[in-house]
Amino acid sequence: MFWKPIVNLLEAEDIEFLVVNAQHIKAVPGRKTDVKDAEWICNLLRHGLLKPSYIPDRNQREMRELVRYRRSLIQERSREHNRVQKVLEGANIKLASVVSDIMALSSRDMLEAMVHGETDPETLAGFARRSMKRKKEELELALKGTMSSHQRMMLKTMLTHIDFLNEQIIELDMEVAKRLAPFQKDLDRLDSISGIAPGTAEQILAEIGTDIASRFPSAAHLCSWVGLVPSHNESAGKRSPPKHVKATNISDPHSSKFLTP
């Protein structure tokens, strides 16, 4: 992100600037120097041929960073859950075959007991709550394993890391909610769309902002910007098969796509 420090300085001095995709301003092949490149860019600017990339204001950029960082922590937490499952499998403990979430309250109590040295399947199954109590026999069979001191240490470290990630995610949730409070009506409208959860609504607002009309003349422009429009390539009267633009992260202003599964 070489453009960010410069943009921050220019923005602080209230100087108008353009961030332009380098692929859109390539000069004619030949002798290439920094001076010639500068002259070429100046000529393009004088003739109005520079197409600026969309650079949100500082508030929205900060909002994007918060939402993206939260997303990365959530993904890391999921990876840590998978590591816990791998440790359990290595200890021949098949907890996931009985419970749908090994990080639910009952399962977490069982894991904590394992960390503290508990190995008796009946005792571990006794931590089951509510509907899980009906699966006590299955739990006892699934919890018959052999956990070494090494695996116990690994499990303890992973659970500690998960707790830390949970705390950080909650803190980010609070900050995101505070910053988006003035746009609650927009969030509610997005949340009313089938398939869009509150977290997704927050991400959409953070990425495209609320002043969409000033940036995108139509819905088609917005769809193209996020990479949902097939490309159209034609040469000598022949059309190549359409391909959707690959959606990437818009932390790069020249690769301004953000919708990911």
What are these regions (language model features)?
Residues 1-261:
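A detector of single, family-specific signature residues
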